Amino acid sequence: MLPISYDAQTGYIQYYTPTEELTRGDLSEFPTDAQLEQTVRERLQKFEPELADTSRIVFSSATYETNVSSKTVDVTPEVNGRMVYGKYHISISFDRDGNVTALTQQYAPLKMGGTRTVRLADAKNVQARLDAHDFSANIAQELTDCTITGFEQAYYMNAGFNAEGDYALYPIYVLRGQGTAADGSVQGFEVLVSALAG
């Protein structure tokens, strides 16, 4: 049985294999993205059929090609057809043989409340936030020759409880791109910027 950890502040639960028990290897020794996506979708279809067709499966970018202990898949629900970033997802880590080594439930019960209509930021607002470094990104190492290859409007869910003890969804813009790492490999990245006007 895998050890379990619980974060009382967020309500997140994780089952995990201790790092020292994992066998490291080259990324090429692990199942391909397509193989793991099929595995995850089949399990969703079997155990959570209502989520199988409305979830996006995203692969965490591997920082290195060697000395890799696991490959992680994020299963992210959608709201009105838009991806939800932040802490509202499930992460599944696999070893070289395709066995699950960690399962992290990264969401807490959502207290349903009211909704409101908000204005979205325009290109000028977004550029100002980028210039002010008012964004978050999943870039694990310094990259050069970066280019933006895609754009999407999505949602972000707060990482912690707010003053009322529940969560809220906010619109965000997701800029996808790629750049060159120090070893010459091309790495993908995402930049998340608030899409609220003002």
Residues of each region from the PLM?
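Preferential activation on post-signal-peptide N-terminal prodomains/segments
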Residues: M1-D53, V58, P77-G81
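Exposed beta-strand-loop-beta-strand "reactive/processing" segments of non-cytosolic proteins
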Residues: M1-Q9, A52-D97, E152-G188
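Residue-identity detector for glutamine
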Residues: Q9, Q14, Q35-Q38, Q45, ...
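A short, surface-exposed interaction/processing loop segment used at functional sites
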Residues: Y15-F30, I92, R96-L120, G188-G198
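N-terminal start-of-chain detector that recognizes signal peptides
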Residues: Q45, T63-T66, T147
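Charged, low-complexity helical/coil segments in non-catalytic cytosolic or luminal regions
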Residues: E48-P49, S55-I57, G86-Y170
